[in-house]
Amino acid sequence: MAHGRQQDELQDITLLGNQDNTYNFDYRPDVLESFDNKHQGRDYFVKFNCPEFTSLCPITGQPDFATIYISYIPNVKMVESKSLKLYLFSFRNHGDFHEDCMNIIMNDLIELMDPHYIEVWGKFTPRGGISIDPYTNYGRPNSKYEKMAEHRLMNHDLYPEKIDNR
């Protein structure tokens, strides 16, 4: 029989259930929190669908909107979802290109969790008639996950969807 988590396992989780949250409008990677993966002997994906991502164009200051898909195979640590929400919200006034934002997010999550594998895919709404969909991934070096990352990168968008102004 599976048992729930004990209080001592949750002591580093401070945002979930906290009604007194601060919503930062400037980039804040320090808001990310993690917890232990209780299923380390098994490979499995965790996927976050984040349809309300916003950042700013570094040149014009105009807002950019995207749905971000974050998928990872955890190792020892996992990201806590409310902290991820607040972290993504902190990009609201962050001025960077779409490609930079996706790589920053992936790098911050790698630093937090040290996952076996992670991918971050941003599907931005069109501006000027062009949508940009940066995809970035990482697999632990010298492991099957490194090979997996290479394979997924080469095959990630073989059947692109019809763009219908999202």
From Swiss-Prot:
The active site is at 57 (thioimide intermediate), 64 (proton donor). It is found in: Cytoplasm. It catalyses: 7-aminomethyl-7-carbaguanine + 2 NADP(+) = 7-cyano-7-deazaguanine + 2 NADPH + 3 H(+). It holds the Pfam family QueF. Keywords: Cytoplasm, NADP, Oxidoreductase, Queuosine biosynthesis. GO terms for biological process: queuosine biosynthetic process; tRNA modification. Pathway: tRNA modification; tRNA-queuosine biosynthesis. Its EC number is 1.7.1.13. One of its GO terms (cellular component) is cytosol. One of its GO terms (molecular function) is preQ1 synthase activity. The keyword Transmembrane does not apply. Substrate binds at residues 79-81, 98-99. The keyword Amino-acid biosynthesis does not apply. HAMAP family: QueF_type1 (MF_00818). Belongs to the GTP cyclohydrolase I family. QueF type 1 subfamily. Catalyzes the NADPH-dependent reduction of 7-cyano-7-deazaguanine (preQ0) to 7-aminomethyl-7-deazaguanine (preQ1). This is NADPH-dependent 7-cyano-7-deazaguanine reductase. It comes from Staphylococcus aureus (strain NCTC 8325 / PS 47). The gene is queF.
